[in-house]
Design a protein with these regions (language model features):
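Sec-dependent N-terminal signal peptides
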Residues: 3-13
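Low-complexity, acidic/polar, glycine-enriched regions of mature
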Residues: 15-196
Length: 196
């Protein structure tokens, strides 16, 4: 009788005896990319990417309050298909990887802003500068993996622009935007999987 009463009260009060956190998703790097584009001489888009990164994602569209996103990028992995330019970008003139080897984003909240559209609000750190940042992203879809029973695959896309000077990426003569524009377009394509 006591168990029946307790169960009834649980239902009436809207509480579930088991509270499940959003799933932890595992990144599939073979289907993920971290890319960026910067204009050269204000006219020519030059594309690059970071090839070493980690994404820690706990996410459920139905439980955004407990969802979180943390990203760590190894700046040493920068690749613009030009070894000399990559070395310069790693130098004190730009990222100064000897002292600041990672770019990090840590969410403090995730909000829905439309159908399958979300914004992760948190802090972005580049070099030794940390600023509040809103990272928009789209849930492209979720499907069951036909080759792995019980495994769900999800895909996300994020496109945004940052001003490199907000993070002091450009010292001395490289503060000017004649050669390398201040505006950097970033595109993230992320595929993850989890056992749901």
């Amino acid at each position: 009788m006591k168990l029946l009463i307790a169960s009834t009260l649980t239902v009436l009060l809207g509480f579930s005896p088991i509270q499940l956190d959003p799933p932890t998703w595992n990144i599939d790097k073979s289907h993920t990319s971290v890319g960026f584009t910067v204009k050269h001489f204000q006219i020519t888009p030059v594309r690059g990417a970071f090839t070493d990164y980690d994404v820690d994602l706990q996410f459920s569209p139905d439980d955004l309050e407990n969802s979180s996103l943390n990203v760590t990028i190894d700046v040493n992995s920068i690749d613009t298909k030009n070894e000399r330019r990559d070395g310069h970008l790693k130098s004190e003139d730009f990222f100064n990887v000897a002292e600041f080897s990672t770019i990090t984003f840590a969410s403090q909240s995730i909000e829905a802003v439309g159908e399958n559209q979300f914004v992760a609000k948190g802090e972005l750190t580049i070099r030794d500068v940390t600023r509040e940042f809103e990272l928009p992203f789209t849930l492209l879809g979720m499907v069951e993996n036909p080759f792995q029973e019980g495994v769900t695959v999800a895909a996300f896309q994020s496109e945004f622009q940052i001003d490199r000077m907000d993070y002091e990426v450009g010292q001395g003569d490289w503060v000017a935007d004649l050669v390398a524009a201040h505006e950097v377009d970033v595109e993230l394509l992320v595929e993850v999987n989890a056992e749901l």
